Amino acid sequence: MREIVHIQAGQCGNQIGSKFWEVISDEHGIDPSGQYVGDSDLQLERINVYYNEAGSNKYVPRAVLVDLEPGTMDSVRSGPFGQLFRPDNYVFGQSGAGNNWAKGHYTEGAELVDNVLDVVRKEAESTDCLQGFQLTHSLGGGTGSGMGTLLISKIREEYPDRIMNTFSVVPSPKVSDTVVEPYNATLSVHQLVENTDSTFCIDNEALYDICFRTLKLTTPTYGDLNHLVSATMSGVTTCLRFPGQLNADLRKLAVNMVPFPRLHFFMPGFAPLTSRSNQQYRAITVPELTQQCFDAKNMMAACDPRHGRYLTAAAIFRGRMSMKEVDEQMLNIQNKNSSYFVDWIPNNVKTAVCDIPPRGLKMSATFIGNSTAIQELFKRISEQFTAMFRRKAFLHWYTGEGMDEMEFTEAESNMNDLVSEYQQYQEAAADEDAAEAFDGE
């Protein structure tokens, strides 16, 4: 079976990660103690993608929980599903990274990383045919960004041919936690560009907008935001966990979605969007789902897809629906909005269908877009980075941990290169002028 090892690092990663486990445990009929209490064979058919069968009828997540301070771990452990995880898989330090990327990547994190890798290795060895890894983390803090990227590169060394996926929460200007977020994020992106196969960019600002505008929540909490993220994560991983008419796995996803190795930053979306309190009971149709899916308001990254073009996109539909109708609607969208899709990748929209809808919904759709508009997000971070870096503000926190200014300059130019690559492909046309641009690749 194609197993996935899940890693969650830092405060944000652990909060999103534990929410994700709540959602998928619920979908698979696993109760908080790991007992199977479900009612359908389909729940167990591919349960071993994410769970180890520990004893008769007891399932344990293939999850590794990492943090440089015990606080968040304690709240996960005392949370609703805290007893689900293997106690040995909680790996934490005592010192904290203090929102400092250098601490997570070079000093504090580097001391803890071997302990984490031991646990990862143990999880990987208990698999039959490991498909890859997924990491949940944020890019604005110290642990998730610094130590998260360190873990990625270490795992990459040891398992070079396995897929590496990340769900990365990108800092946003409106919802800021720390002043050094642009530094941490830029240093992280510098790593992600080289070391991951796909990165789902989740953006607090976009999540807040969805909560305000669509879900009509007046004061969204992080709980509400994480609920949205977990819905998306559950959608992206559906095909791996349930049988369906058209299945995908992490590698197929990467093959279909990544036209050039560096351009693997995706915008996720979800439909229908409903608030936690009223997950609606009105019937939704396939055309509505498809429409909503591609709607800018439903994107979990604060970029407007109408400002760029889709290089590739994928939609994962869940629920009992007619394949024919799904295909028709997807074609319909592409024909109507053809200017938003690059013309030099024919049929660049992939569809997958899984028969089992999420809890409380008749059908849902998860959208994954590789759009050149994601450059807005990197531009935004880059501008903030440059503003501070020009004055060398806050740099001493990083150089004090042994970092060199050179590394900042490199990260900055790598991110700017990424932005111009997106721009280049946005403007490229299918005719021969574009062909020359590719020869230079």
From Swiss-Prot:
InterPro entries: Beta-tubulin_BS, Beta_tubulin, Tub_FtsZ_C, Tubulin, Tubulin/FtsZ-like_C, Tubulin/FtsZ_2-layer-sand-dom, Tubulin/FtsZ_GTPase_sf, Tubulin_C. It is found in: Cytoplasm, Cytoskeleton. The keyword Lipid metabolism does not apply. GO terms for biological process: cytoplasmic microtubule organization; detection of mechanical stimulus involved in sensory perception; detection of mechanical stimulus involved in sensory perception of touch; mechanosensory behavior; microtubule cytoskeleton organization; mitotic cell cycle; positive regulation of detection of mechanical stimulus involved in sensory perception of touch; positive regulation of mechanosensory behavior. GO terms for cellular component: cytoplasm; microtubule; neuron projection; neuronal cell body. Disruption phenotype: Defective touch receptor neuron synaptic transmission with reduced levels of rab-3 at synapses, conferring touch insensitivity. Irregular touch receptor neuron shape. The heterozygous mutant, but not the null mutant, rescues the touch sensitivity defect in the mec-15 single mutant. Expressed primarily in touch receptor neurons. GTP binds at residues 11, 69, 138, 142-144, 204, 226. Pfam families: Tubulin, Tubulin_C. Keywords: Cytoplasm, Cytoskeleton, GTP-binding, Magnesium, Metal-binding, Microtubule, Nucleotide-binding. Belongs to the tubulin family. Dimer of alpha and beta chains. A typical microtubule is a hollow water-filled tube with an outer diameter of 25 nm and an inner diameter of 15 nM. Alpha-beta heterodimers associate head-to-tail to form protofilaments running lengthwise along the microtubule wall with the beta-tubulin subunit facing the microtubule plus end conferring a structural polarity. Microtubules usually have 13 protofilaments but different protofilament numbers can be found in some organisms and specialized cells. This is Tubulin beta-1 chain.
